[in-house]
Structure formats: C-alpha cells, structure tokens
Regions:
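Acidic, His/Gly-rich catalytic cores of divalent-metal-dependent hydrolytic chemistry
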Residues: 169-254
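His/acidic metal-ligating clusters that form di-metal
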Residues: 110-191
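Active-site neighborhood of divalent metal-dependent phosphoester bond hydrolases
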Residues: 43-128, 133-134, 166-167
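Divalent metal-coordination and catalytic microenvironments
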Residues: 9, 35, 50, 61-62, ...
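Residue-level marker for buried hydrophobic side chains located in beta-strands
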Residues: 6, 30-32, 58-59, 137, ...
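Active-site-proximal beta-strand elements of phosphoester/diester hydrolases
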Residues: 3-11, 135-142, 217-219
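N-terminal active-site segment of His-dependent metallophosphoesterases
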Residues: 1-53
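Active-site environment of divalent metal-dependent phosphoester hydrolases
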Residues: 11-15, 38-41, 64-68, 145-146, ...
C-alpha cells in the first residue's frame, strides 16, 4: 500500500495535475475533492486526465454539479444546436462560473453520453481510516459529522459555505477529521477573523488550513488564481506544494 493523499479544486490547471503525477509513486492514491475544471487554462483536458487516472478517486464538487446539469439539459434539449444552449439557465450558470471551455470541450467529444454518465455517478462524500485510526471524512464543501453513517443532503455536501463559521460541537464525532475544499482558504481565514476578532492584520495563508480544534482542514488554495496547490498526506498530514511558473513566491500563501 502506498501513500494516500487528498487534493482539491485544481480548476483546469493541467500543469499542476502533471506535477502531481510526476510526484506520485505507482502505488499511491489521491482523493480528488471536486472542482476539476472551470476557470483555469486547460479545463476539459484536466477533467479528462483526472477522470481517466486510476490513481485518482473523485468526489463531486459544485462545478461538477453545474456541469452535469448543463450536460443533461444539452443532451435532452439542445443537441446539436449549442448556440441555443448557452442561453439556457444551466448553460448560463456554468458559463458565469468559468465553465465555457469545460463545456465546449465536452461538446466536442464523440461519446458525450458516457462522460455525462461517468460524472453523474461521482459520490458526494468518501471516508478513509488512517494509520492512527482517525476517521477522515471528505466532501467538496465540508460538513460536521455527528454519526459515522449520517450525512447532510448532497446539496449541502457540495455547496455549503456556512459550517466553517462554527466551532466543533460537543456532540460531534470526537475521532473524526473532515477534509474539504470549495471555499478558498483565504475566505475562511478572513471570515473567521472578522467574526471572532474584529480588526486584524492580514495573515499569511497556509497551504492547508486546520480549524475547529483540529477537526477540519480546508485544502482549497485557489489554484486558478494563486497557481499553486497542495497534496495532503492523510496519514501523516504532511503537505506537498506544487506550483506553476506563474506562481509569485512573495504572495501571501506559504
């Protein structure tokens, strides 16, 4: 058994995916916590590479959710007239969130229905029990677990941006750790400072942000605008940083 990692929100940054692949050993595994495409430089190619990679197990993110709904509408009502599709509700929502290149890449595929089916089957959460016996829950947006077999609705697992504002409840699972993406670390840090401390000096943002008394960790580095991402080792919690030539070492990210 190799090492087990988590990564999230690559958002079409194919170069970061390629660097991760060079780093991985053949027996390693990566949980990809959603948002493979949209906003970046090689959106559909990144989605294809990750989905076709046996070392990656993918969780559905909100950008996959938007893409799937757009695909469904296209297959049902707009194929083969893509011009009309971009005026539809699902199409315009996806485009507004940086999904134009992702959608056009899919439209050019000859096996569009297969890609739709594969993405539509993605889970909204996964679990991993690490070498120290910690139960690691993973979803795109994050959540607070109260029992091992009870989960919030899929919409919340994919889209929620509220759970990180609250402390770890006394009745939540004590042995649990939640790893997630969705909300870039800088927004979580800024919100928590604003709600708990008033005025503050802007901190240097970490690559992996631990909070809720060490029970939660966000690994969304905003790859499409920071040009960096992190692999988090789920057994040792060691962080491995990857960045493109456009990364600014003087930026406020460690």
């Amino acid at each position: 058994m190799g090492k087990v990692y988590a990564c999230s929100d690559l958002h079409g940054m194919l170069e970061l995916y390629k660097q991760i692949k060079e780093f991985l050993q053949p027996e390693d595994k990566v949980y990809m916590l959603g948002d493979m495409g949209d906003r970046g430089t090689d959106c559909w190619e990144t989605v294809k590479a990750i989905m076709n990679d046996p070392q990656f197990e993918v969780i559905k993110g909100n950008h996959e959710d938007m893409l799937i709904k757009a695909m469904k509408d296209y297959l049902r009502a707009f194929d083969p007239d893509p011009d009309l599709f971009f005026y539809s509700r699902s199409g315009s929502l996806l485009i507004h969130n940086g999904g134009m290149d992702t959608m056009k890449g899919w439209m050019a595929e000859s096996n569009k229905a297969k890609w739709f089916n594969d993405l539509n089957k993605l889970p909204t959460h996964l679990e991993y029990k690490n070498k120290d016996g910690k139960i690691i829950f993973m979803s795109h947006a994050g959540f607070t677990p109260y029992a091992e077999d009870e989960f919030p609705p899929d919409e919340e697992l994919i889209w929620d941006r509220n759970h990180y504002l609250y402390a770890w409840p006394h009745d939540a699972l004590e042995n649990a750790i939640v790893i997630h993406g969705h909300t870039p670390i800088e927004y979580i840090v800024d919100d928590q400072h604003r709600f708990t401390r008033g005025s503050y000096e802007l901190p240097k943002y970490p690559l992996a942000y631990w909070y809720a008394d060490g029970h939660k960790c966000c690994i969304d580095n905003g790859a499409f605008f920071t040009n960096c991402t992190v692999l988090l080792d789920l057994d040792t919690f060691e962080e491995h940083k990857f960045y493109t030539k456009d990364y600014d070492p003087e930026a406020i990210w460690d």
